[in-house]
Amino acid sequence: LPVLPESTMTYVAVSNYGEPARQIVKIFREELRESEPLRKWWGSSDVATEGPKVEAFLEKFSEFEEYLGNETVLAGTMEGKDPKFLLVAETRKAGLKSFLEQWMTQLADKGKPVARVMDTQGLASVKESRPSDTPIFLVRPDYIVMGDEAAEIRKFAERLDKKSGELSSAPFGQRVAKAYEGGTTVLAAADLQKIISKTATGNASNDQSLKQTGFGDAKYAVWQHTGAGSAEMSKGELSFTGPRHGAASWLGKPRSLNSLDFVSPNTIVAITIGLKDPAKIYDEAKEMAESTKSNTFAMVPMLEQGLKFSLRDDVLGQLGGEITAELDSLAPDQLKWRAILKVNDTTHLQKTLSGLLEATHTEATKDEAGGVTTYSFRGPGGPDGMPISYAIVDGYLIVGSGREAVAESAEVHRSGGSLAKSKKFLASLPPGRTREASGMFYEDPVAMASMQIGRIMPDLAESLTHGSQGSVAQTMWVYGDEAAIREESVSAGLDIGGALVVAAIAIPNLLRSKLAANEASAVGSLRTVVTAQITYGSTYPVRGFAPNLATLGPGPEGSKGETAQHANLIDASLAGESCTANEWCVKSGYRFRMTANCKQRNCTDFTAVATPETTNSGTRSFCATSDGVIRYKVGEPLVEMVSGAACKAWQALQ
């Protein structure tokens, strides 16, 4: 901070993360060492193919951080319309230049360096006058500086030599210094008035529009993260040069967010916002649109005339400004969502909603249960449209993905078992705060992490989601003050990144469980085949054993017929029509196939085999013959069918 120029407009400081990076590598390597399933996944999945590079990068990054001071700063300025950024950090031990040269050589792409490493003498010889595609690291005994323009780096180096900097005494610098009080691990700040003045279009109409929104008076944006473990906390502030006005004032003052009493304690994501009077917001938005000659509201009169209602008076005027949206399930076929809105006049709003359904020729069913009247209909798309239900309960409008979703919300509210009453939610409140706020964002971090893991290993996503029931809440609270909008959140020791680490560590156990389930299913299926073969032989003694799985299964007519060609002893999931002696059939992560030794339609022996689809679905192949013994072999999935003699050489399953 003391060495930066007064013209600095953006400031980002990050604490030294060398040790955390080292710990991540250590933990992951331990898991790789102990878990064969994880090693196979790491070596075969799409993401895992990049794994060794990621691991090596983290290791190098932790080594790099050993050379640096307590924090690294990214400072931004602007000359004309071109932003300029420099990365600056103190150095604390010798050898950094050699380390960087070696690392950049390793990262070089086909001989093209990704960055140039120089000392002061080397930098002086660079004659470039424009930003370069290849950034420069200037390594000095006291500082390391990185940028894409040699002239800017030289200018900053001169400032370091003179130990001169004006930012500390400037108002923006003083605001940044204030954020450091009490300690911080990550700090980001922007002088918005400087940025606005530098990026002004010169178009009076555009500049006036920005001013009219209220955001043209934005002063500073500051965000900081402090503490570690159970003491983690973040704070943000968007301040203004005076009282908030225009769109910047639409966020209301803190209030008790009572709509949270309708939110399920098992929700994955919930967002609540407290607006000022929605009807007044409509008026201000319309006025702004008209002043800029925007046609945003041009279609509203036609819409109102056709549907015979007033958007302002009949809808927005009946809402109290408090809105909550929640998502309870991420499964595409079981998507469950709800929206809860504060209502001023329930009778007026119900009349309006009924009129809109009638005007749009939407058929709605009406159900009454437990004192709650629920209306259900289909969204756009007719019978295939999304199911939507709504009910007005105790002064709140509940809209959800079907009757069940709405009924659950009403029950949660009346039973007092809502998210707002749960221990993990209450523990997420910032110190000294209640749930009086202008807005709130909530997430279940492990459930959110399952979405990321699910992209890599879809069969694990459901397990991770189920494991999120006892996870720590992650919430962000927003407060609308007269001349600022503030944000506070408590991580309680586990944020999304932490959840992903936990999930990654849990993968071996989840994989073991999945593999065990697949293998147990495969063994059970082979036992079913053996039993079916015995039954087939006694039913059709002239034929002996069935020649393939399809013969043991149902025929084209389904489960009605029982013939020697289709004995209907096994269901189609294992013995479909395509499951011939030359084809593999798939069930529960395993491929199945059966052949037989036959002469003139009489089969005297058979071999049935089950082998994993991939190395991620099992580690053992299984087989069985007419002796009824299940045998196994550890190794890669089979490509070819095995003979009866080869099967009998495998290890018998105990």
Language model region names:
Residues 1-130, 169-221, 235-333, 347-363, ...:
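Structural boundary/hinge residues at secondary-structure and domain interfaces
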Residues 33, 105-108, 158-161, 358, ...:
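Sec-exported extracytoplasmic/periplasmic mature domains
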Residues 73-77, 132-142, 323-329, 386-395, ...:
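Short, surface-exposed beta-strand/loop micro-motifs that present aromatic residues
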Residues 130-203, 383-464:
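A conserved glycine-rich beta-strand in the N-terminal activation segment of trypsin-fold
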Residues 318-319, 368-385:
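Flexible, glycine/threonine-enriched loop-and-boundary segments that flank and lead into catalytic domains
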Residues 491-537:
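Amphipathic alpha-helical segments typified by the pilin-like N-terminal helix
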Residues 528-619, 624-627, 634, 646-654:
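Extracellular/periplasmic head regions of type IV pilus-like filament subunits
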Residues 637-640:
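A short acidic/small-residue loop/turn micro-motif
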